[in-house]
Amino acid sequence: MNTSLRLNHYWITCADGLETLLQEEIEQLGTKVTERKAGRLIIEGTLEHAYRICMWSRLASRVLLPIHTYELERTHDARDVAEELYEGAISFDWSLIFAPQSTFAIRLHAEREIKVNTQFATLRVKDGVVDSFMEAVGRRPSIDTKQPEITLYVLAGKTEHTYCLDLSGDSLHKRGYRRFMTDAPIKENLAAAILQKAKLQERNPEIVLDPMCGSGTFIIEALMILTDRAPGLVRRFGFNGWHGHDRELWLSLKAEAAERHEKALEQPLPKFYAYDADWEAVKATRENIIAAGFEKLLGDIQIEERTLADWPDFGAENKTAFIVTNPPYGERLGDKASNRSLYLGLSALLQKNFPNQYAAIIAAQIEQADVLAFEAPETLRLMNGKLPIYVRFGTVKPEKVTQPFLANWQAQPVEMEEAQDFANRLQKNMTALKKWATKENIYCLRLYDADLPDFNLAVDLYGDRLHVQEYAPPKKIDPEKAKKRFNLALAAIRAVTGLNRDAIFIKTRARQTGTNQYTKQSTANKRFIVQEGKAKILVNLTDYLDTGLFLDHRQMRLRIAQEARGKHFLNLYSYTSTASLHAALGGAASTTSVDLSNTYLSWSKENFVLNGLTVDHADEQHMFFASDCFEWLKEGHEQYDLIFIDPPTFSNSKKFHGTFDVQRDHVSLIKRAMNRLTSEGTLYFSNNYRGFEMDEEIEALYDVEEITSETIGPDFKRNQKIHRAWKIQHPGLN
């Protein structure tokens, strides 16, 4: 059955989740929405209304004019649907819509209940249109699937098939400016929807920042909104070959849009910042901005290759800022853990640089969005193609200015009948360390380390949490007696520090052999962030015997941070690569971290991402290798200016053939590493083996200086044997 053509009835399609925003936009354009369905709005209006939506809608996907409805009288199977679509197509005189010399294409969509081979059914619709032309005028149009002059949109339904003329031609999200692509881009209409949901124009910002700009979509869409630039001003449409096209009407709307844009350009614009860690993305952004027609505005747009760790001083204290970005989730980054660290790092940067300013951040998982520190957050779920995304909107909370725990701690009288000596010693240590920790901003330090023989434990402070390690008692000590003493010590720790039970994490530490330190102790996975120098570091006080941060090497890491600028840094037995992190934040030209454990290298990458540094091997700035260090040194030839080696005392990993003994093997290890050290470079070698002696061969071959005293902080002065460290250089430098 053929229904007559109505020029006041249109379908406006959109991505799932945009229906409400699209309805608001359409009604602002002066058109009434009469019906709303998932991914589609139906309007009643004139051809001018449809043209205005084509010209001005930033959110719509397509503007469709239903021109023919074929009502069904049969039940469905796959073959019936295709034949019905053919019958529906041939039953309409398509020569009334477009000329046979025009090219056309078919876009077929089926409702969920309809099972049909869309490729075959599309061919049958094409056959029906062509056969209709042959019957009507004796000539047939040609198919062009890439740039057709006419696009027919067909919806296969349960009771009827609807044939529409696609006035938009190509999807309206294609504005015509995207000349260069990056991985996992955001569609233009979704970017515009996010900006409109965030009320960009009403906020009238002085700064617009996209710190991970990709191909520049957010920056360009913001420019279009703030300069009143119609998204359809310079693109092709699907109505030019339509017999019903009103060319004069369209040209008048186009002239009106151009005039509005020129007038808006006379108004002051915010300063735009478009950053990305990938040079190709920076290049794509610049080229796309030019392609969008904003070349004259490049002076107002700072487009630079920058990581999150390399933000400038925006001078935003007294300015209104708007931050929007599509972080490299999923395809653009990798595992969920690294993604979460990225959002934690971004949130911290926003709190520091843009407190009380408005932001809109895309996330692939809701858990990523949840770590963003926003006041009164709102979340919008959208579909970016087939990929669900979550957009978190909100005002950035101000940064919490924290001081080291000891800065605010005050000694109080403590009475502990059976553990008074321990309580007094712990309090004495904390009092002695308070001034140093406060002055140097030390957040993580050792408070007690088996100072008294009856209390054989270590107490470490990580931020505002305690890590208490009970050293395994000698066999001659009664286990019940040892347990009682440990419980007394815990009570004293709570009394002296004032910390609750949930801030104290307890482990038993035995002598380490092989890879015990890498054995998981629990599955709690409760990691949190601590500060050391410029670095934010993830620590875990529950899952492993070691926490992810060796406190005794703090001074060495800070030394590396001071010496690393402009240098190529190598970290062997890197563990969670905190030394590499300090080197990177200190301005190292590159860092390379080598460790046998994939678990700790993954943790390493999270530390880097948390601090806004890239971990993509493609740029070769920060590299991570899961390898035996001996083999890795043997296979490569790259030279390094600064090398740090902190090997285990002993190792017999399943991944490593044979064993490693630091006393036995340090000569060959150091010699291989020195072969990779530049002529004027420095190698730092350290280990925790109390009986270690540097071999005379190393002292004969190189300039060797023991610097142990320089690498032990005040919190470890009570235990001078915690580690030993040497500075090693090629002969003749001193």
Swiss-Prot record:
Which keywords does this Swiss-Prot/TrEMBL entry list?
A: Cytoplasm, Methyltransferase, RNA-binding, rRNA processing, S-adenosyl-L-methionine, Transferase
What Gene3D superfamilies does the annotation carry? 3.30.2130.30, RNA methyltransferase domain (HRMD) like (3.30.750.80), Vaccinia Virus protein VP39 (3.40.50.150)
Q: Where located?
A: Cytoplasm
Question: Where primarily located?
Answer: cytoplasm
Reaction catalysed by this enzyme:
guanosine(2445) in 23S rRNA + S-adenosyl-L-methionine = N(2)-methylguanosine(2445) in 23S rRNA + S-adenosyl-L-homocysteine + H(+); guanosine(2069) in 23S rRNA + S-adenosyl-L-methionine = N(2)-methylguanosine(2069) in 23S rRNA + S-adenosyl-L-homocysteine + H(+)
Group of enzyme by EC: transferase
Q: Name one Pfam family in it.
A: UPF0020
Q: A Gene Ontology molecular-function term? A: rRNA (guanine-N7-)-methyltransferase activity
Residue stretches making up the THUMP domain: 49-167
Its EC number is 2.1.1.173, 2.1.1.264
A cellular component term from Gene Ontology for this protein is: cytoplasm
Q: Does the keyword RNA-binding apply?
A: yes
InterPro entries (alphabetical):
23SrRNA_methyltr_KL, DNA_methylase_N6_adenine_CS, RlmKL-like_Mtase, RlmKL-like_Mtase_CS, RlmL_1st, SAM-dep_methyl-trfase, SAM-dependent_MTases_sf, THUMP_dom
Function description: Specifically methylates the guanine in position 2445 (m2G2445) and the guanine in position 2069 (m7G2069) of 23S rRNA.
Question: Which family does this protein fall into?
Answer: Belongs to the methyltransferase superfamily. RlmKL family.
What is the protein name for this chain?
Ribosomal RNA large subunit methyltransferase K/L
> Native species of this protein?
Acinetobacter baumannii (strain AYE)
